[in-house]
Amino acid sequence: MKKIAVDAMGGDYAPKAIVEGVNQAISDFSDIEVQLYGDQKKIEKYLTVTERVSIIHTEEKINSDDEPAKAVRRKKQSSMVLGAKAVKDGVAQAFISAGNTGALLAAGLFVVGRIKGVDRPGLMSTMPTLDGVGFDMLDLGANAENTASHLHQYAILGSFYAKNVRGIEIPRVGLLNNGTEETKGDSLHKEAYELLAAEPSINFIGNIEARDLMSSVADVVVTDGFTGNAVLKTMEGTAMSIMGSLKSSIKSGGVKAKLGALLLKDSLYQLKDNMDYSSAGGAVLFGLKAPIVKCHGSSDSKAVYSTLKQVRTMLETQVVDQLVDAFTDE
């Protein structure tokens, strides 16, 4: 049985969206048990009672505006810290939260701990592409500043995840840069390029540009945390703007626009599904001793369900154990 701890109080729509996502996952997957950390009365309001879900009542909650490291140190009885501690103590095998990203990163690093040999765990998510396949990108903001050796390690981590969790036999690894030529970029990216090109364990395809990200040019995209976070938010904003603009144009376009939308209904739904982050799961803080996964702050029950499904796959494939072995062998 796979044991997953969940922060029921994190996110914009907690605990309702969190608990409803858990209800669906418990219904669909008979091999998982969930520990919900948070306000028991609020959780019980939405929970479908089952022996495979337990509630650990907590009085404290880390808020979105709390200073991350300070909150983790001071709010030791919060749903987030206790959930992370459950993983450290072996009570749970993985932890999910839609709460304060910085605090979750701090809890992951200071409570759960990083794998020996991993310098900087990276925040990694599967991003949408127009063909629906997606690509893994890291770092998405766990580290604001990175060295070339960090990017080199991200490439190894990302390739390992794409192969062992997403089932891509030979993942194509690209370095996000301001041009595709080998000589492009600042000193950081030039040095990183040399390290990646010389790394025998990955299939490095060279530099890639941001404009090509959604065209499935790579399976893994490596970047520094500052740039990665900016790209993530740009992609989210662009997707929302495109869908909003289409909807507005159809509504205001009269009968012809509505008829055209009706004829294109299946294609429009496919586009919406391909651009939907909620079906891909959460962002993994990869490089820690256990799966620690961040749901989007505005996650609905579908996104929570997808994240539980993602974590279940990570536990099933034992990707973290394999990663520990890989770094031990180096």
UniProtKB/Swiss-Prot annotation:
Keyword set, alphabetical order: Cytoplasm, Lipid biosynthesis, Lipid metabolism, Phospholipid biosynthesis, Phospholipid metabolism, Transferase
GO biological process terms, semicolon-separated: fatty acid biosynthetic process; phospholipid biosynthetic process
Keyword Lipid biosynthesis: yes
Catalytic reactions of this protein: a fatty acyl-[ACP] + phosphate = an acyl phosphate + holo-[ACP]
GO cellular component: cytoplasm
Enzyme class, broadest EC rank: transferase
GO-annotated molecular function: phosphate:acyl-[acyl carrier protein] acyltransferase activity
EC number: 2.3.1.274
Compartments (UniProt record): Cytoplasm
Top-level lineage group: Bacteria
Its biological purpose: Catalyzes the reversible formation of acyl-phosphate (acyl-PO(4)) from acyl-[acyl-carrier-protein] (acyl-ACP). This enzyme utilizes acyl-ACP as fatty acyl donor, but not acyl-CoA.
Quaternary structure, from the entry: Homodimer. Probably interacts with PlsY.
Protein family (similarity comment): Belongs to the PlsX family.
Protein name: Phosphate acyltransferase
